[in-house]
């Protein structure tokens, strides 16, 4: 009985860990909603706020746990497909089809990077959650904006590592870096910028 209670407690603790910090989520979502409402027409502002909420949750959880919950990545992917169907100038079906193709292509590319790194280094560098996040960003972003999104995330990660090194923190080749914590904000920034100019 004790072991059963211990297992239940461990599962409950894990579930709590994979929940976003409500202060971060609510406060951040309010900020995203305000910025979106100020600069975008209301349908795009609603889409931007939805994406921002998912990305805030993902960044917060990944920064603490190095995990991206399926609920977050799947929700971001599905809402991206809904947005594609809503805003595509040709038709809803065409929007969903092109968004699905972008999602699959982006996930396949990052999956290839993951497999290549594992073969080369003998250990995993990217988690499956990162691949699912790549699919979600592919659904949301125009294809020409996807490289910019990854560039922003990479630059932010490198700056963070550099600052940690300057503060005296020991950074090694095997030091884990939560990609989602940097990629999630980059996804929203790229989407917002794309919506703003286009």
Q: What annotation goes with each model-predicted range?
A:
Residues 1-198:
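A membrane-topology feature that recognizes alpha-helical transmembrane segments
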């Amino acid at each position: 009985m004790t072991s059963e209670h211990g297992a239940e407690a461990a599962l409950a603790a894990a579930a709590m860990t994979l929940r976003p910090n409500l202060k971060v989520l609510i406060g951040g979502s309010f900020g995203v909603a305000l910025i979106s409402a100020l600069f975008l027409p209301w349908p795009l502002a609603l889409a931007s706020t939805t994406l921002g909420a998912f990305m805030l949750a993902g960044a917060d959880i990944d920064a603490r746990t190095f995990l991206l919950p399926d609920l977050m990545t799947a929700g971001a992917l599905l809402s991206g497909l809904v947005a594609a169907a809503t805003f595509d100038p040709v038709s809803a079906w065409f929007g969903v089809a092109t968004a699905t193709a972008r999602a699959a292509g982006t996930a396949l590319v990052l999956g290839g990077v993951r497999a290549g790194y594992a073969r080369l280094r003998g250990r995993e560098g990217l988690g499956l959650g990162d691949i699912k996040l790549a699919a979600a960003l592919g659904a949301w972003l125009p294809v020409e904006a996807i490289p910019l999104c990854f560039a922003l995330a990479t630059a932010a990660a490198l700056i963070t590592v550099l600052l940690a090194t300057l503060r005296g923190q020991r950074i090694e080749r095997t030091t884990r870096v939560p990609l989602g914590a940097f990629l999630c904000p980059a996804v929203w920034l790229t989407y917002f910028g794309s919506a703003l100019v286009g």
